[in-house]
A protein has these predicted regions:
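Short, well-ordered beta-strand core segments
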Residues: 29, 80, 169-172
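A basic- and aromatic-enriched beta-loop-alpha substructure that forms the phosphate/nucleotide-
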Residues: 73, 78-96
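Conserved P-loop
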Residues: 2-74
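Structural motif
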Residues: 5, 81, 132-134
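Catalytic phosphate/metal-binding cores of nucleic-acid and nucleotide-processing enzymes, i.e., regions
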Residues: 1, 75-76, 111, 118
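Residue-level signal for inorganic ion chemistry
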Residues: 18, 49, 81, 136, ...
Length: 189
């Protein structure tokens, strides 16, 4: 299977499409969940996602160091779903923000996100598995009103661009419909 990046807005059908692609492959799947259950609502979302996955799929729940942990847990899986980069980048922020999330060490966060995505890119190139990576498109919204929000948007945008360069296909989800972005349907793009 190819390496695929699926991006789009919140609740646009990204995870469902990723699972559909993996299911249709008929291969063994390792599902990598990056969410941390910080409150009841998030715990409920995580549980909904767990129930939506086939029982035969292996699950790795990891909030950071994803690229290091996948090779340890891949086993015989031929497909790896990572859901999602959005939360992975957010988890990197959590390590360096103060308790009120008002101050952040920008250099350390940038370094951590760069390291995290670099390890993931290396993992993708090293393993003989197809990767289906889910992320959010946050660049189409309003400019965040604070420094942390703008930094998050910028770093997630850079992470998405790096991953898009590494994969064979990129899809943008709109209202549950996948739009192929890469390879482009336009010559030379």
């Amino acid at each position: 299977m190819k390496n695929i990046l699926i991006t789009g807005g919140v609740r646009s059908g990204k995870s469902h499409f990723a699972q559909e692609l993996a299911r249709d492959s008929g291969e063994l799947v390792l599902f990598v969940a990056t969410a941390a259950a910080g409150d009841d609502e998030m715990r409920q979302r995580i549980e909904e996602h767990r129930r939506s996955r086939p029982a035969a799929w292996r699950t790795l729940e990891v909030t950071t160091h994803v690229g290091d942990r996948i090779p340890q847990r891949i086993g015989r899986a031929k497909i790896v779903i990572i859901d999602c980069i959005t939360l992975l980048v957010s988890n990197c922020f959590g390590q360096y923000a103060d308790a009120n999330e008002e101050r952040i060490d920008v250099a350390l966060v940038e370094q951590e996100v760069t390291r995290e995505i670099g390890e993931l890119v290396e993992c993708i190139s090293r393993l003989e598995a197809g990767f289906v990576i889910v992320t959010n498109e946050v660049g189409a919204g309003l400019v965040p009103p604070n420094q942390m929000g703008r930094l998050y948007r910028d770093l997630l945008g850079k992470a998405n661009q790096l991953l898009a360069q590494q994969v064979d296909e990129v899809y943008l989800m709109v209202a549950g419909l996948p739009l192929r972005v890469k390879p482009s349907q336009y010559p030379g793009k």
